[in-house]
Amino acid sequence: MCAPSDHWRLGSKDIWETIETLSFHQSDKGKALDDFQLLIDLHKNADRQGPGGDAESEKALSLAMVDRAVPLKIADIGCGTGASALLLARLLEAQVTAVDFLQDFLDGLEGRAERMGLSDKVTTLCCSMDNLPFGDEEYDVIWSEGAIYNIGFEKGVKDWKRFLKTGGMMVVSEITWLTADRPSELQEYWQNEYPEIDTASSKIEIMENNGYSPVAYFVLPEHCWLDNYYRPMQDGFEAFLKRNGNSEKAQAIVNAEKKEIALYEKYKAHYSYGVYIARKLV
């Protein structure tokens, strides 16, 4: 559930394939894993690993017209440390399967669920989002905030469709252009980070072409980025660096995050996460 520009395109098996298949020397493999562990360390204690908000998740739930009194099965794919999974469990009569490929994040989720008295409603599953062990038409709702980019928007809505019951709801957030024209610096940055970034109309067309009926769409507001994600991350930079001995690699990660934050603050009128809500037709 991390922002694409955090270099967290890792919810599938990509990181492991990269480590195993690239022509690394053994020492380079170790360095890659060390870098990965630093990223986990930066994010694992956060409430969120990407832009979002409880009010916005509840808005999506309302727009999806999910009956709060009916027992449901929900899969939250790319759940991170569980902000959305726990909200769904709290608000609904639902059994939530919270999926992430990072056990560190799931450990945090399980601790939060226990403290909130929700352990009986949330089951964690550590696996890749492109190798989900679900049955056909197993779920009433598939939910994924800030994570579908890991395997690509089109692949995600296409592959996950079979897990949804007919008439079930897909709720996903995806990085989205808000303007027709963008500064070249921003365009180049995102084309490098996530080439599938596109306008809402293009994303909605993809859902329609893959057997969904669009129900609603809205844009995450600025506070979901700044107040709920970036500012808490910034508050943790000093402790993160201290934990990791102010190493060059840790400092490089912090600098990359600062660059990303500055880019958003400069160009926030041009992009955000869009929340896409659609019903499975067939």
Regions of interest found by a model, annotated:
Residues E196-G211:
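Short alpha-helix
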Residues V141-E154:
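A short SAM/SAH-binding and catalytic strip from SAM-dependent methyltransferases
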Residues I175-Y194:
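Short, glycine-/aromatic-enriched active-site segment of Class I SAM-dependent methyltransferases
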Residues G50-V70:
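Conserved alpha-helix/loop element of class I SAM-dependent methyltransferases that forms part
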Residues K155-M169:
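A short glycine-rich, Lys/Arg-flanked "PGG" loop and its adjoining helix->strand segment in the class I
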Residues A75-I77, T81-N131:
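Class I SAM-dependent methyltransferase SAM/SAH-binding core
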Residues F218-V282:
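Conserved Class I S-adenosyl-L-methionine
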Residues D130-V141:
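A short acidic, Gly/Pro-enriched loop at the edge of an enzyme's catalytic core
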